[in-house]
Amino acid sequence: MIPAGVDITDLAQQLHEDGVAYTNPIHGQDVDLNADVAKGLKDGDGIAVVDVAANRAPDVRDIAQELQDATGLDTVVVQTPQYVSSVSDTYSRADIEAVQPHLAPGLAQNELLNQYYAGLDQISFPVSATVGSVTLIAAIIFVSSYWAAVRR
């Protein structure tokens, strides 16, 4: 549930501009701050700093999901006074949930993004290597079985 006081439309509009959004209008209009934070984002990602108290962490994830749906961004990180949450089309839910507990809500946005991406890059699962290994093992088993059957 989206907490009262969170204007998804306004945040989405800010995210469309430079990938950075604030509920605080002073920060939202600070061009230098937004440009500095935007440098820490990967292409297609966004961050929203929401100065509204959320009662539960899933509410913050709901904000992130609504913003992703409204903007089409690949990954949306939402920082509130109590929680940090995100949704992504690139990173798995399990990887995101492994990183989020290590992100303190009060971090500066650049530091938050550095820790977020570093944590995700560290635990990224090597899909290509795993698929290649499984394929190789399956081929060895197939060839061994074939030769065993031909010899009989």
Segments the model singles out, each with a brief description of its role:
Residues Q65:
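Active-site phosphate/pyrophosphate- and oxyanion-stabilizing loops and adjacent acidic/basic residues
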Residues Q68-Y83:
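A short, hydrophobic beta-strand-centered structural micro-motif
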Residues M1-D62, S85-R152:
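A structural boundary signal for the start of the first folded domain, especially the loop/turn
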